[in-house]
């Protein structure tokens, strides 16, 4: 028997299609290093871990994916600006130390 079972997973999402999409997206997030929402996993693979998180109810489908995409885009841009600012500050400090 597969764990988590499809029956327990379908209690958390509205359809098999939604389950596949959610598990796939969450597995990609886990592969990218996003913090897990469950402390320990039975599975070593990211898809299995994503399914375990879904079963635990700690990962849900976003009701407004476009808004989430925009929010993530803004967050990425902000992180990029912060890295650039830190790089400029470091370059300025190094330049000042040389003078």
Curated annotation (Swiss-Prot):
The keyword GTP-binding does not apply. Disulfide bonds: none annotated. Residues 65-99 have a biased composition (Basic and acidic residues). Its EC number is 2.7.7.6. GO terms for biological process: DNA-templated transcription. Residues 55-99 are annotated as: Disordered. Gene3D superfamilies: 3.90.940.10. Signal peptide: none annotated. It is an enzyme of class 2 (transferase). SUPFAM superfamilies: RPB6/omega subunit-like (SSF63562). Keywords: DNA-directed RNA polymerase, Nucleotidyltransferase, Transcription, Transferase. InterPro entries: DNA-dir_RNA_pol_omega (IPR003716), Pol_omega/Rpo6/RPB6 (IPR006110), RPB6/omega-like_sf (IPR036161). GO terms for molecular function: DNA binding; DNA-directed RNA polymerase activity. Pfam families: RNA_pol_Rpb6. It catalyses: RNA(n) + a ribonucleoside 5'-triphosphate = RNA(n+1) + diphosphate. The keyword Lipid metabolism does not apply. Promotes RNA polymerase assembly. Latches the N- and C-terminal regions of the beta' subunit thereby facilitating its interaction with the beta and alpha subunits. Belongs to the RNA polymerase subunit omega family. HAMAP family: RNApol_bact_RpoZ (MF_00366). This is DNA-directed RNA polymerase subunit omega. It comes from Enterococcus faecalis (strain ATCC 700802 / V583). The lineage of its organism: Bacteria, Bacillati, Bacillota, Bacilli, Lactobacillales.
């Amino acid at each position: 028997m597969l764990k988590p079972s499809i029956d327990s997973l379908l209690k958390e999402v509205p359809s098999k299609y939604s389950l596949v999409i959610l598990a796939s997206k969450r597995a990609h997030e886990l592969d990218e290093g996003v913090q897990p929402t469950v402390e320990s996993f039975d599975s070593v693979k990211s898809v299995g871990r994503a399914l375990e998180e879904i079963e635990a109810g700690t990962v849900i489908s976003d009701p407004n994916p476009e808004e989430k995409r925009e929010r993530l885009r803004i967050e990425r841009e902000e992180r990029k600006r912060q890295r650039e600012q830190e790089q400029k500050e470091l370059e300025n400090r190094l330049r000042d130390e040389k003078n």
